Amino acid sequence: MYKRQGQELSRNIPDSYRRGIELSASLNIARWFSLGANATLSQNRIENYTEYVSEYDADWNYLGEKELYLGTSTLSYSPSVIAGVLLDFHVKGFSALLHTQYVGKQYFTNGRNDALSLDDYCVTNLNLGYELAASKIGSVRFGVQINNLFNTEYCNNGYGYSSIVGGVREDSAFYFPQAMFNVLANVTVRF
């Protein structure tokens, strides 16, 4: 893939690796309550990485690409920590599911540039439901899904790029903010 001037937009990376460990556990504490947890701890690296940044003069005339050798860098969109906890309550027709997820810092380029990164975040969702047995149709379940229970401000995606204009590096970052506290209601009819 190429830009209008002919330089590459993306490149294959010959020396990279992902290594880590994934853990998960679940425990039924009582017939009506269970606890689950998971975590992924990883290293996501590029060896001998060179970043290529488009360079322009002060009048935005294209001068070429500047090579910036970074050595070992971090793969984009690859947090080193992802973890979650799940609490599941269910008594007769009532159910409650509380899920908290933590996602570590992510870069959205391979350049390990803090100006082009996503902050870590932790978000909690709650699902509540009640199911009634209905003799003629099977069952009816009423549910409420409460997303972002603690009203966390976070972005879970973004993109960006760097350029050098008139000898000064400029980093342009764009983010996708996620919804604050919100509620969805639902009804499920089973035949």
Annotated model-derived regions:
Residues 1-5:
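Conserved small/polar residues in nucleotide/adenosyl-binding loops
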Residues 71-74, 114, 170-174:
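Short, P/G- and charge-enriched loop/turn segments at secondary-structure junctions
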